[in-house]
């Protein structure tokens, strides 16, 4: 034991002389007054509840689900059905709703499901109907209000495509390097542009 040990060695800093608080001390009772009621013993000395104490069926932790109560694979919290087939989307939603305890738990899953699944059969039917309409398209006709309808030869027809005739593309001049002068690819070989 240390030679300079004193039982009240830590009391000196809290004395009024050092704290310099010269206020009056609070009056204390010689004997404390008794409280109303009594202490009910509900546990033994080891902290276990006595058998006479009524127990609640509910967990004291509420609906919290621990790691060992959770399923081995937890479904995703945000599921997108957009790029899935109808069977895949049904399987995913069944998996999410399979464990109701996980959905009800306070720390459980709050799933958000977005999008609609696509049906490959309806996609095939849609593609077939599109190809049928393309194959059954009417023959091309001349659009009278189109600026391109004032062509030099009447056998040049306009396309039935909606964008045809609205914005004509760049026209190559007759003396283009692709067709040499005097070749049969020109409609009027040897003529000037001013004559046509």
From Swiss-Prot:
Predominant place of localization: cytoplasm
Amino acid composition bias (Low complexity), ranges on this chain: 137-149
UniProt KW keywords: Cell membrane, Cell projection, Cilium, Cilium biogenesis/degradation, Cytoplasm, Cytoskeleton, Flagellum, Membrane
Localization (cell): Cytoplasm, Cytoskeleton, Cilium basal body; Cell projection, Cilium; Apical cell membrane; Cytoplasm, Cytoskeleton, Cilium axoneme
Pfam families per the UniProt record, alphabetical: CFAP126
Tissue expression: Expressed in trachea multiciliated cells.
UniProt-listed GO biological process terms: cilium organization; flagellated sperm motility
Cited InterPro entries: Fltp
Family: Belongs to the Flattop family.
Function: Microtubule inner protein (MIP) part of the dynein-decorated doublet microtubules (DMTs) in cilia axoneme. Acts as a regulator of cilium basal body docking and positioning in mono- and multiciliated cells. Regulates basal body docking and cilia formation in multiciliated lung cells. Regulates kinocilium positioning and stereocilia bundle morphogenesis in the inner ear.
Cited PANTHER family: PROTEIN FLATTOP
Protein name as annotated: Protein Flattop
Organism this protein belongs to: Bos taurus
UniProt gene name: CFAP126
